[in-house]
């Protein structure tokens, strides 16, 4: 039951971060492309790589993993919003933007998970 509380606490932090980052990206870049979702997915993927690698080289408590991995990063990143925004781009006739959104979200996020892992592994 304790882990549920850690997930809830981490999730509340991740959700607020996602909201604030999305607002900032909307102010900076406008609404022509879903940069907010892209940024939170890249940031969350990088941090997931770091947490995964830290778990490989050191002992992370189940509470810490629940707080960060499931709670905070689970709420920070969003596949459903990414999918909806991509579909909206397609429905509005922006096929190139939609394909770009998929390629960048998936490709960059996989790459930054790797970078996060390598950052930790190079230090241990």
From Swiss-Prot:
Binding positions (Na(+)): 74, 77
GO annotation, biological process: cellular detoxification of fluoride
Mode of membrane association: Multi-pass membrane protein
GO-annotated cellular components: plasma membrane
MF-aspect GO terms: fluoride channel activity; metal ion binding
Catalytic reaction annotation: fluoride(in) = fluoride(out)
Activity regulation comment: Na(+) is not transported, but it plays an essential structural role and its presence is essential for fluoride channel function.
Keywords on record: Cell inner membrane, Cell membrane, Ion channel, Ion transport, Membrane, Metal-binding, Sodium, Transmembrane, Transmembrane helix, Transport
Alphabetized InterPro entries for the sequence: FluC (IPR003691)
TM region(s), chain numbering: 4-24, 35-55, 62-82, 95-115
Location(s), subcellular: Cell inner membrane
Pfam family, one: CRCB
Family membership noted in the UniProt record: Belongs to the fluoride channel Fluc/FEX (TC 1.A.43) family.
Physiological role: Fluoride-specific ion channel. Important for reducing fluoride concentration in the cell, thus reducing its toxicity.
Protein name, per record: Fluoride-specific ion channel FluC
Lineage of producing organism: Bacteria, Pseudomonadati, Pseudomonadota, Gammaproteobacteria, Alteromonadales
